[in-house]
Amino acid sequence: MSLGAIRIAIMAIFSFVPGLSTINLGLFNITLRGIPVAIIACLFGPIGGTLAGFVWGTFSLIQGLTGRDPSGPVLFQYSPIGFLVTVYVARRLAGFLAGLLYDLIHRFEKRGIISSMVASASVSLFNTVFFLLFYALFFFSRNGTDTNAIVFFATAFASSAANFGVELSVNLVVGSIIVFSLKKGADRLGISF
């Protein structure tokens, strides 16, 4: 129970301290919030990753509805259900699949280097793929007759796809280093996650 509270507190700090987890690029933000999700997914498996993804989705929802994320109010206006699915399902799937990948790879690669790198990078990959899929499903095709909406959503779609490289690189490096270090330290102390 206390580990869960600590994980949520770390994600809250990471989400709401300005400049700590987000690089603002206008309409969309490059988010570094996948890093704690990757770490939790690697340490606590698919269920931990799913719960971390849920927390990430909750904080994304709060930021979207309060205007901290500039795309949130616009997307919510077009489709409240689509907005909820996009922020919750994409992030939960990203956490679950990262934990699953880590567990699968770690069975064959006991040191944890490759498994932590793949799982950390996969959070960005899965989040971006599912985000763009839900985005296209709920928002882009719905407003095909409005020229302004087409331009807005095409720009938002392109910028979201473009920030993927930065998110992937940062998650790969930072997430895997932290996971590998925590695992090694825990092994030396005789602690298992």
Which role does the model predict for each range below?
Residues M1-F193:
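Loop-helix junctions at membrane interfaces
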